[in-house]
Amino acid sequence: MTKVVAPVERVVFELNGERQEVAAADVEPSTTLLEFIRTRTPFRGPKLGCGEGGCGACVILIAKYNPKTDEVTEFNVNSCLTLLYSIHFCSIITTEGLGNTKDGFHSIQKRMSGFHASQCGFCTPGMCMSIFSSLVNADKSKKPAPPKGFSKLSISEAERSFSGNMCRCTGYRPIVDACKSFESDVDLEDLGLNIFWKKGDKHPDPTKLPSYTLGGGICTFPDFLKSEIKSSLDFNDASISGPREGWYCPKSIKQYYKLVNSGLFSESSVKVVVGNTSTGVYKDQDLYDKYIDIAGIPELSAIVRKDKGIEIGAATSISRTIEILNQESELTSSPNGSVVFRKLAEHMSKVASPFVRNTASIGGNIILAHKYPFRSDIATILLGAAATVNLQVSSKTLHVNLEQFLEQPPLDHSTLLLSIFIPHWASDCKKEHTLVFETYRAAPRPLGNAVSYVNSAFLGHVSLDKSSGDNILSNLHLAFGAYGTKHAIRARKVEEYLTGKILSASVVLEAIRLLRETIVPVEGTTHPEYRVSVAVGFLFSFLSPLCKGVIESGKTLSISEDLVDTDNVHNKPLSSRRETLSDDEYTPVGDPIKKYKVEVQASGEAIYVDDIPAPKNCLYGEFIYSTQPLANVKSIKFKPSLASKKIITVVSAKDIPTGGRNIGSTFWFGDEEPLFGDPIAEFAGQVLGVVIAETQPYADMAAKQAVVEYTTDGLKAPILTVEQAVQSNSYFQVPPERAPKQVGDFSNGMAEADHKIMSEEVKLSSQYYFYMETQTALAIPDEDNTMTVYSSSQFSELAQNVISKCLGIPFNNVRVITRRAGGGFGGKVVRSLHVRI
């Protein structure tokens, strides 16, 4: 094979002040930074929560150095998505690098403790790193210097600093207070209960707060790594490769096509990456042994300002794109020219979370929207702004509008998305016209960190009809997405109908009727009526201020610069709260005191089950779940894949020791649930077997390769709803000793009631427990047929009982240890037992 690039045999970076050098042959390219930190270093601060960039438990700070400008850039990222090979010559800081029991705790960690901002503590290290990143970047800004001991961070920035971090315990208020305490203009009296001063003090003393050094007080990029970068001949090398796998870093488009056309990937799976954040949305279905990292191609990160707009490289991060759009909005003198960029930036700041936006590329988001039915906000709002894309197809460069691109069939590696061009529309808007542009989104969390139920973007030119004084729309772009469609679309019929018409109530109603014909969710879309109604509401919100007869009686809206620069009512307000305090009758009972070991939780040194160092030759397991309700399991096979080769064995009901039982859990009512669905899977999601592999990622991926064959011969139809259970007379029998006792006479009480509900129906759906720490257990066999199980459990005695029954050993031969749990809320009582066993 022709040599394409010179290989580099190592990955060099700094971790909490220490130089790390990893031989490429020792670490596979699919290894994430989180996996490396937790399995190859003593640091356990970053936690594995959701594993998809949605919870923030794994957040760390990355610093990059540019030797050409001698500048250091710091930003926080999800270490669960960041691939280890992508941080070559970077500096990494985890919460242990901020402070610890040996070197002393950082003021962030101390204030998290003092403001009672931690309960289970599993999310706390990630919270600390998000706050630290915000402080570092705020202190580097050109804002006036704050008083000693404070940061340049504003209150709104403080609230947004951990907008992507989840906490199930605290309700966020104490975390917000801890972060706000760094802000120089904060009213200390408004901060919540803390140990630094008594609630009600009229003049709290800020010097009692743990001292803070401007800039965070931590060196984010060491001099030794700067020197190594400057002197290293590897800095511009194009690949990192080992004997089995490869990580390729082309430094030009030409090098990229040399790699693609080299035949190197003809018999292996290859993945093209920039930030690898797509795996948080669409999970990899198999392992990859070769990666092409295109983030280092300069052309893909170039920013080109043109007469009619701006061209942004496809590998530019979403965070960087927001900065650029805001800068362009400020530089553009015309209100018509600034509105598009400003509104786009505002909307993009609500996409994903800050640490996802820091690494996710704008081009990658559009590629996802093209390849999958991804509910992309960015694709929709760029479609509304009439953006175009530039593609490289082998030796040809193509320019197509975004709508055409989204409708194309999936691309192969021979096609490269180069850039996105966004027009500012200033020069296209006549003097007598005013440009209007608005974007909308409806989501479970409308201000970010959740995909949309519906999103839209509307652009148009508004002019006045001289005879009537009414508004007329032209050059309309009405884009809708995420409502249950493969990709974002333009409502062409509505655009054509509205163009040139004088806006009135009847015109708006007809436009809504046409929109309902256009917005048709595909079959299987959840809540289709809701999505359509939201889309209609967005269009109405856009048109109604422009239309007489829809706005309040007696008011008219003239076209002016005010129309262009209206405040976005969807912008995030500063949060508010209300505290109810008890009196001092029983003091000191109820006085705020510091919770035990919060600093240790904040520094990442508190040990949860998955933080326990794995014993030598430790194996890992992942469940194979039933995908069918009430079906006979005939066989379990595995697809031929890279992941399937990692399987050591599969444990099932036949592997239960002699004398043991197929028992997975037991209930207070006396019923038992089997550990494995054998020979019948009683419900979808029941465990059928456990894949065993050398690492947890191997086991997780291998379990996805399982192909289960079912048959329903001789079985009745499954009962899937409460209504079906009632109809089938299938009731859960509560033992008499467990049944609730009747208090009073129900019949007499109803007869004497002043108000009666004669008939009503109430439905309660299921709800996630949403504990941050996932179900985890570590089992270590010991002498004399005993077993020690470290478990994140809320009922260790029950776990001990069920494990002994399953293994067929005496109760006292099982030792279950629970040091702490990263949340539970009832979800780690019975449902955790399968994992323990």
Swiss-Prot record:
Database matches in Gene3D superfamilies: 3.10.20.30, 3.30.465.10, [2Fe-2S]-binding domain, Aldehyde oxidase/xanthine dehydrogenase, a/b hammerhead, Aldehyde oxidase/xanthine dehydrogenase, molybdopterin binding domain, CO dehydrogenase flavoprotein, C-terminal domain
Cofactor, how bound (note): Binds 2 [2Fe-2S] clusters.
GO terms of molecular function: 2 iron, 2 sulfur cluster binding; aldehyde oxidase activity; FAD binding; iron ion binding; oxidoreductase activity
Domain FAD-binding PCMH-type stretches: 240-427
GO biological process, one term: auxin biosynthetic process
Domain of life: Eukaryota
Protein name: Probable aldehyde oxidase 4
Species the sequence originates in: Oryza sativa subsp. japonica (Rice)
